[in-house]
From Swiss-Prot:
This is Betaine aldehyde dehydrogenase. CDD domains: ALDH_F9_TMBADH. The active site is at residues 168, 256, 290, 467. NAD(+) binds at residues 156-158, 182-185, 235-238, 258, 290, 390. It comes from Agrobacterium fabrum (strain C58 / ATCC 33970) (Agrobacterium tumefaciens (strain C58)). Its cofactor is K(+). Binds 2 potassium ions per subunit. Pathway: Amine and polyamine biosynthesis; betaine biosynthesis via choline pathway; betaine from betaine aldehyde: step 1/1. Keywords: Metal-binding, NAD, NADP, Oxidation, Oxidoreductase, Potassium.
Length: 493
């Protein structure tokens, strides 16, 4: 396979603050790499403490005037941003593919489009979703109102950089906050374009600032006294550190962390559909999706049919140039991630799992591309490393089970609780099983569909708080209660 050299994706500068690009060459330099070839497509600088201070000060200055605007006026700007994103979907999707290595056939339908949906949704509900309550108290009464928190920090992951930036910015902004957003150093480019588009849509300067950085930058943001809220998408270890730091200052937090989610296939399920769900829930974005159903529990009577169908369809997937619309599976985000995933595959083999297909680097790619074949293990047991730890790559574990009670107990025997799914023709059983699963986001007879109208988030070690839907506004605002007396104060002294 020969991959055409992509155009350079160098931004005007590393950071976007107060409505314009900003550079500080004293920051640590780092490269943005196209994962399909290993080629540098941009060179940027991590934020220095001075850049962090500048971004937060800019956000703080802009926030109060923004909060004083009506929700409808704020929402109008977000809806305009959604329109611009849709007009530029091709260019934004290509940039997302260069940034992440994900196939263009995915990014064109699932990345900037989802971000635009978030801006449109929150812009649309702004006039009504922030209303408070009227509480009659006899002659007196009280009312509540939702008020913004102030300056919020968003910290993104590298699997859906544009989507994550929008999922965090949309509820924060419509609630009257400002946001300083730090994308992953692996995928630094998309958020800068989102910032440009918001300014073009009419967002006042300073309300959405983007700064670059790595694990050393996060603490500067999280520990800043002017930051009221932190929203992180990332791994469980990172989430623990960020939550602990935020707790020291009693900051509001939303944690959207990792998972090892169960997908349960009963023997009465439509096997073709269940296999499709398992493939989407393990191989989409080369398996780099936090909610993936990487523990696929298949009832024993259906196991042979399931594996035969799965093997045939997996081996028909097209791996290759992510800029080619025919490609199903692109590279992982980096060589480091490739090495991590390959090491888990070796652990699966060593611990006795049966390798059904995949398990290595595909023959049709060479050089510096971070590719891994879509991999299926069968005969996996609950104690195997590949069944317990989040791999974040195209590795599916298929486990057997006999009955409903058994599979529920095993599915819940994990520290994670992000997601789960069930495939069955018996809808009564489907509802019973999802009620029993200890997870925040669940699907019946499908998997990994996340429209912005529904809340998304986890439980247990997979995080807390919710993104998307009107529920997200509760995490970017707080209630103010006002008691109104209609009479004189009756004091006993």
């Amino acid at each position: 396979m020969t991959i055409a050299t992509p155009l350079k994706a160098q931004p005007k500068a590393s950071h976007f603050i107060d409505g314009d690009y900003v550079e500080d060459n004293t920051g640590t330099p780092f490269e943005s790499i196209f994962p399909a070839t290993g080629e540098m497509i941009a060179k940027l600088h991590a934020a220095t403490p001075a850049i962090v201070e500048r971004a937060i000060a800019s956000a703080k200055r802009a926030q109060k005037e923004w909060a004083a605007m009506s929700p409808m006026a704020r929402g109008r700007i977000l809806k305009r941003a959604a329109d611009i994103m849709r007009e530029r979907n091709d260019a934004l999707s290509t940039l997302e593919t260069l940034d992440t290595g994900k196939p263009i056939q995915e990014t064109i339908v699932a990345d900037p489009t989802s971000g635009a949906d978030a801006f449109e949704f929150f812009g649309g509900i702004a006039p009504s979703a922030l209303n408070g309550d009227y509480i009659p108290l006899g002659g007196d009464f009280a009312y509540t109102k939702r008020v913004p928190l102030g300056v919020c920090v968003g910290i993104g992951a590298w699997n859906y950089p544009q989507q994550i930036a929008c999922w965090k910015a949309a509820p924060a902004l419509v609630a009257g906050n400002a946001m300083v957003f730090k994308p992953s150093e692996n995928t630094p480019l998309g958020a800068l374009k989102i910032a440009e588009i918001l300014i073009e849509a009419g967002l006042p300067k300073g309300l959405f600032n983007v700064i670059q950085g790595d694990r050393d930058t996060g603490p500067l943001l999280v520990n800043h006294p002017d930051v009221a809220k932190v929203s992180l998408t990332g791994s469980v270890p990172t989430g623990r550190k960020v939550a602990a730091a935020a707790a020291g200052h009693l900051k509001h937090v939303t944690m959207e962390l990792g998972g090892k989610s169960p997908m349960i296939v009963f023997d009465d399920a439509d096997i073709e559909s269940a296999v499709g769900g398992a493939m989407l829930g393990n191989f989409y974005s080369s398996g780099q999706v936090c909610s993936n159903g990487t523990r696929v529990f298949v009832q024993k009577k259906a196991k042979a049919r399931f594996l035969e169908n799965l093997k045939r369809r997996t081996e028909a997937m097209i791996l290759g140039d992510p800029l080619d619309y025919a490609t199903h599976l692109g590279p992982l985000v980096s060589k480091a991630q490739q090495e991590k995933v390959l090491s888990y595959i070796e652990k699966g083999k060593a611990e006795g799992a049966t390798l059904i297909t995949g398990g290595g680097i595909p023959n049709n790619v060479a050089g510096e591309g971070a590719y891994v074949q879509p991999t299926v293990f069968a005969d996996v047991t609950d104690d195997m490393t590949i069944a317990r730890e989040e791999i974040f790559g195209p590795v599916m574990c298929v486990l057997d089970f006999d009955d409903e009670d058994e599979v529920l107990a095993r599915a819940n025997a994990t520290e994670f609780g992000l997601a789960g799914g069930v495939f069955t023709a018996d809808l009564a059983r489907a509802h019973r099983v999802v009620d029993g699963l200890e997870a925040g986001t669940l699907w019946i007879n499908t998997y990994n569909l996340c429209p912005v109208e529904i809340p998304f988030g986890g439980s247990k070690q997979s995080g807390f708080g919710r993104e998307n839907s009107a529920a997200a506004l509760e995490h970017y605002s707080e209630l103010k209660t006002v008691y109104v007396s209609t009479g004189k104060v009756d004091a006993p002294y």
